[in-house]
Amino acid sequence: MPMSLRLHNNLTRRVEPFTPLDPSSPTLYVCGPTVYNYAHIGNARGPVVFDVLAALLRRRYGALRYARNITDVDDKINAAAQAQGVPISTITDRFAAIYRQDMAALGVVPPDIEPEATAHIPQIVAMIEQLIANGHAYAAEGHVLFSVSSFEDYGKLSRRDPDEMLAGARVDVAPYKRDPGDFVLWKPSSDELPGWESPWGRGRPGWHIECSAMAAAHLGPTIDIHAGGVDLQFPHHENEIAQSECAHGGATFARFWLHNGMLNFSGAKMSKSLGNIETVHDLIAKHPPEALRYALLSAHYRQPLDWSDGLIEQATNTLDRLYGTLRDLAALEACGSSGVEVSKTIPVEVESALQDDLNTPLALSVIASIASEARALRNELVHGGEPSARMSELHAVRAKLLGAGLALGLLQQDPAAWFSRGTDADDDARITALVQERSAAKKAKDFARADAIRKQLADEGIVLEDTPQGVRWKRA
């Protein structure tokens, strides 16, 4: 019997056992990007964390319907398109493609469904019409607004009191609103802005209704898990609940709500508005993408994460050690001439950590323990052991380490590829040739030439390591 999967449900503020409505087809919806610019590294935390969750759900239930949307109509997109004098699709197509490339570099598996708002205008209009028919929305001056007072449970996710929210609303409330807290479902578009025909005139949808309509279109009126950044909890997720439950006769919109914490940079939340962002696109050009993924998983997903160059360096050094261990184990297995493919099995300790509300720090500590076990075995065999006599142990510990990494989307590269990062194939061959020349020079006792080659490589940022299995090299 599999262990219980327990997740922190922000709706109840408790860690609870999770069982999907349909165990043969769990559903997961994650709020995706608004594609008007490069994603910053804080935007990547959710996709990476919930990528681990999606993989866990697939292992546990054998299937998953996972949707992550693309917001491709928005006032920020409109502003960017107007500034450049191009259609919004020029902006959105470009940055959606870059986003997908950046997420792929971080090892994020694409969702099963990636709905775009502009492809769901009929569903959005239909949901708005249903809300009007149900008495939860009203048309005014070309706008359609959701009536917050019509939904008694408004505020149940964020635990905000509706009266206090209304008291704190802006003083200059739009005159077409019945109440200050009412929010836009549809807004009119001028000729220079993108728009679609609707019963209320030419216009475009509000942000919140887009997610409600897309989630319902692809996953149904009730989904098992809705996830996103904690900054979206209010008003976005609160408004999604109100719209969806009022449109579907009170049916629960999402049974579990998961929110990842924010990234901090020098003590402040990382955000475009504060100007303290680092984009994923820039970071993957400077650092190993796998190290960025490791760093994003190094703290529990619900906690804030202090982002720094030191964190990236620490993650890179840790992966150096782990890949070095895998490389040494593979070399020892080669000595035994086994030729047997390693079967990756996820250790129960790692699976248990992830089943406990995605405890990735604990899972990473288990990986470190397995690597220590592997290095101890390696040292024992190097210093007097016989690899061929203990091939089953070598297989088992390497499979365990690879399986542990697999659960987190780590350690799946060939170690040679990891250590040759930042070089192309021709450069790899050149460096390998120099390493071989140095070994030959040492054998011939031409130590001056050997030292000169080591210095040349060091100047290029190449570190050499003499091991019982031969000379290894890696980028510093």
UniProtKB/Swiss-Prot annotation:
Gene3D superfamilies: Cysteine-tRNA ligase, C-terminal anti-codon recognition domain, HUPs. A motif ('HIGH' region) lies at residues 33-43. Pfam families: CysS_C, DALR_2, tRNA-synt_1e. It catalyses: tRNA(Cys) + L-cysteine + ATP = L-cysteinyl-tRNA(Cys) + AMP + diphosphate. Zn(2+) binds at residues 31, 211, 236, 240. Monomer. This is Cysteine--tRNA ligase. The gene is cysS.
